[in-house]
Amino acid sequence: DSISLVQSYFYLTGFAGKELSEDAFATMDTYFNKLRESGKKAVLRFAYETAFMGRAGTGPTLEDVLRHMEQLKPFLAQNTDVIQVVQAGFIGAWGEWHSSFHGLEKTNDSKRTILEKIVWMTPKNRMVQVRVPEYKNLINKEDQSYNRISFHDDFIVIKPHQWDGGMHE
């Protein structure tokens, strides 16, 4: 037995307001090649911000996020073999969908737009994970992409909490 899945975060912090650079793609490509060489796959998340509770100094606009997803789509398609799943990041602290500098998590319209674009950019043979169960319901249940959305829990749910999606024990 050996490690086969790696939680992988790519922080796009320096790219708010501009295009992703060739150097950024070269760095990600080097990382994916190392995963490929070692027989591992990524649980992949993109994020911009690493602070919360009003401490982030800057963050992406909705337009930044959507533009970067346009750039990332062909790159993810080229690296599908080393991607196990894509987590719906991009918004707020650590891509956890809270505390974003521009308040991207504050309206269902912006969350829905971002989630639909994440599903769009993710290769069709890969699932997308959301952190809170009700985020899946931002997508119309009749939409084929609805069945490609699952969830992950990166905190232990032991008591009722505003972010637990009603899943507390």
Each language-model region and where it sits:
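Alpha-helical structural signal in soluble globular domains
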Residues: 34, 38, 71-79, 117-121
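Well-ordered, non-membrane alpha-helical segments in soluble/globular domains
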Residues: 21-31, 62-72, 105-117
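Catalytic-core regions of glycoside hydrolase
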Residues: 85-87, 92, 96, 100-169
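Short intrinsically disordered, low-complexity coil segments enriched in acidic
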Residues: 1-4, 169
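Active-site groove signature of glycoside hydrolases
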Residues: 43-53, 72-105
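Aromatic-lined substrate-binding rim segments of carbohydrate-active enzymes
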Residues: 3-50, 61-65, 122-126
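Acidic-enriched, low-complexity/disordered segments with a strong bias for Aspartate over Glutamate
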Residues: 1, 23, 29, 64, ...
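Extracytoplasmic/secreted cell-surface and envelope-processing proteins
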Residues: 15-18, 51-57, 94-98, 137-140
